[in-house]
Amino acid sequence: MKDYQREFIEFAIEKQVLRFGEFTLKSGRVSPYFFNAGMFKTGGDLARLGRFYAATLMDAKIDFDLVFGPAYKGIPIATTTTVALYDHHNVDVPYCFNRKEAKTHGEGGSLVGAELEGKIMLVDDVITAGTAIRESMEIIKAHGAQLSGVLIALDRQEKGQGQLSAIQEVERDFGTQVAAIVTLGDVVTYLEEKLEGKVANQPELAENLASIKKYRLNYGI
């Protein structure tokens, strides 16, 4: 695990984006952790978030021409990622996002930003069922562009209804690569390191770690 990945996990915990406990998911599963990127909600949060996305994108070495953020959570992510790419990596790329409802006045249309063309890097917070990716693929195809890759914050590494994760299904169905700032495995490693580094007893930390490991045995890939 790289330093920026540890920093991202600490950042997510600090901002209560990553929380531990018992959370009932839409699938009905009771998860020992919850990730809500909507809790990144200040200018400073977004600036830091963009740096993590940009660093991961540079590490992934996926060729792309444009960053696309699906409405709604993908919009600020696409914006801050492209700013960070320019500020920290001297890479200046266009970005674009869609409206949920097309405008019928003014400039009109369902897209805002640059022309949706060439090789597209789609950015979002997580992939749960892959629905947003499939909807975005329809938009990308309609404009004659191609999906080059997908970048998300957290890979849950969790099976869907079958044996594959939602991410593996996206990679299979669209022949594309999905990169993540961190995986659930990275979170486990982070917690293990924290536990080993503490002299004092950390029952809550140990309990969270044990719960996640048990959950992974049942639902992990």
From Swiss-Prot:
Pfam families: Pribosyltran
Keyword Transferase on entry: yes
CDD domains named among the record's database cross-references: PRTases_typeI (cd06223)
Gene Ontology cellular component annotations, sorted alphabetically: cytoplasm
Highest taxon, organism lineage: Bacteria
Swiss-Prot/TrEMBL catalytic activity: orotidine 5'-phosphate + diphosphate = orotate + 5-phospho-alpha-D-ribose 1-diphosphate
Pathway: Pyrimidine metabolism; UMP biosynthesis via de novo pathway; UMP from orotate: step 1/2
Cofactors, names only: Mg(2+)
GO molecular function: magnesium ion binding; orotate phosphoribosyltransferase activity
Residues that bind 5-phospho-alpha-D-ribose 1-diphosphate: 26, 72-73, 99-100, 103, 105, 124-132
InterPro entries documented for this protein: OPRT (IPR023031), Or_phspho_trans_dom (IPR004467), PRibTrfase_dom (IPR000836), PRTase-like (IPR029057)
Keyword Magnesium: yes
Top EC category: transferase
EC code(s) of this entry: 2.4.2.10
UniProt keyword annotations, A-Z: Glycosyltransferase, Magnesium, Pyrimidine biosynthesis, Transferase
Example GO BP: 'de novo' pyrimidine nucleobase biosynthetic process
Binding residue positions for orotate: 34-35, 128, 156
HAMAP family: PyrE
Assembly description: Homodimer.
Family assignment from sequence similarity: Belongs to the purine/pyrimidine phosphoribosyltransferase family. PyrE subfamily.
Entry function: Catalyzes the transfer of a ribosyl phosphate group from 5-phosphoribose 1-diphosphate to orotate, leading to the formation of orotidine monophosphate (OMP).
Protein's name in the database: Orotate phosphoribosyltransferase
Organism: Colwellia psychrerythraea (strain 34H / ATCC BAA-681)
This protein's encoding gene: pyrE
